[in-house]
Amino acid sequence: MRIHDLDPENRPRERFLSSGPSALSSAELLALVLRSGTRHLNIVDTCQRIIAENGLERLASMTLGELQKTPGIGQAKAMQIVAIFELNNRLHHTRNTNRRVQGAKDVFEYMSGRIPDETQEHLFVLHLNTKNQVTKCVRVTVGTLNASLIHPREVFKSAIRESAHAIILVHNHPSGDTEPSNADRQVTTLLKQASAVIQIDLLDHVIIGKTSWFSFRESNLLG
């Protein structure tokens, strides 16, 4: 069935105009953006399928090639989907500019959407000013943390150049389990000692999962 074959009151566009975007399902909202389907698939059915198979969270990180594996999604529609989520990421980043950090929860929320490939570990350094506002986010390494491979010079280089007052380390655990490993503890100890020498305070090391986080400071493990 094509969208035009639906009763007018059941069409996504008409319902959007009469009741607002909150009245539509995620598939219907996506269908409004993509607009048209194929001869054999209407766009709402196509959007329902892609969301049912992947969920919004995975959909937000899918590549053009992955999206095009869904029947009815060609290159142009795949680009539209990627563009929607990229705009959302940029809005999130804009809202978090100069965000004041008062605890690990703030760090978790700030980092939401900033990790490009959550199947790998990424180590980030957040620069803070004297008001504990984040002034910069720098990715230092990609891959499992290892104290023998991470040199304090690389971690603090940008912070020194930017005259940061303090830093916070952030890295993700792809498994979702935020419990620190022995390597995480060793890296934290190494960088805390270096921060005392460099005189740029290491305020915290936060490990983030999909829905939770672990704070070395809040767990009294920062030293």
Swiss-Prot record:
Zn(2+) binds at H171, H173, D184. One of its GO terms (biological process) is proteolysis. One of its GO terms (molecular function) is metal ion binding. It comes from the Bacteria. InterPro entries: MPN (IPR037518), RadC_JAB (IPR025657), RuvA_2-like (IPR010994), UPF0758 (IPR001405), UPF0758_CS (IPR020891), UPF0758_N (IPR046778). A motif (JAMM motif) lies at residues 171-184. The keyword Iron does not apply. SUPFAM superfamilies: JAB1/MPN domain (SSF102712), RuvA domain 2-like (SSF47781). Keywords: Hydrolase, Metal-binding, Metalloprotease, Protease, Zinc. Residues 100-222 form the MPN domain. Belongs to the UPF0758 family. This is UPF0758 protein Plut_0598.
